[in-house]
């Protein structure tokens, strides 16, 4: 049996977090997801663990008497913005010396999915490469998380990256505006700016999560090289030395800054995460600092 994507200890820590959106969309609730707890006459949907600072009025005291543990009752107050996680499963995500980018990316996707489900968000896990794969849809609480985790565990890498085609098909498949979290290395022969702008123009709020292996940014190679493109199979021969490495790293950083500017220009957010950073540290560090979760 494969190891779980997210262990139980981290899941409990994730219950403190909320996926945060900045836009207020007509007919849907925007901003902080804090209105989901106690409220007389509201529809009960789920429980979560009590954390310091939570409202004691929302505690299920009957559960406390039976289990000697504090749980908060959660209620659905209004329709919520859909949270859609676009997960890159193209061949380039297979690279990475210490665990590939794909394994790392789907752990991030699992964590974001759990945060959303605990807060009663409507979640869509949408894999893509040169086209959209089958999606997983869930809402209504943490009891759906195991199904989501199984879905992510069973995903297979394949295909080249076609951001524009994936974005076009995504808009057609999910016309309702919402929050789109893209988890990818963003390595596409075509410029990623146009498809990201396309998503924003249709009213979606963007959170761009770029993951890379250390060797993506600072290749350890030296000498005469014959490199093969992981997605197309094309070969290129080149000489690589410390000067070429410095130029390459500078170009990589410039591209990351370009993605950041694309996100900010469209009132979205960007976070870049090397896979050498532990997943828990990435969640409570860069992703929290970016405002994607809080």
Put a short name on every predicted segment:
Residues 1-36, 172-178, 188-294:
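Von Willebrand factor type A / integrin I
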Residues 1-139, 179-183, 189-190, 194, ...:
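An amphipathic, basic-hydrophobic helix/alpha-beta surface used to engage anionic
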Residues 62, 156-160, 184:
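Short, flexible loop segments at the rims of nucleotide/cofactor-binding pockets, characterized by
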Residues 93-97, 154, 243:
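Short coil/turn segments at secondary-structure junctions
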Residues 103, 157-164, 250-253:
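Conserved phosphate-coordination/catalytic loops
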Residues 107, 111, 161-168, 257, ...:
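Short, contiguous clusters of charged residues that form electrostatic/catalytic patches at enzyme active sites
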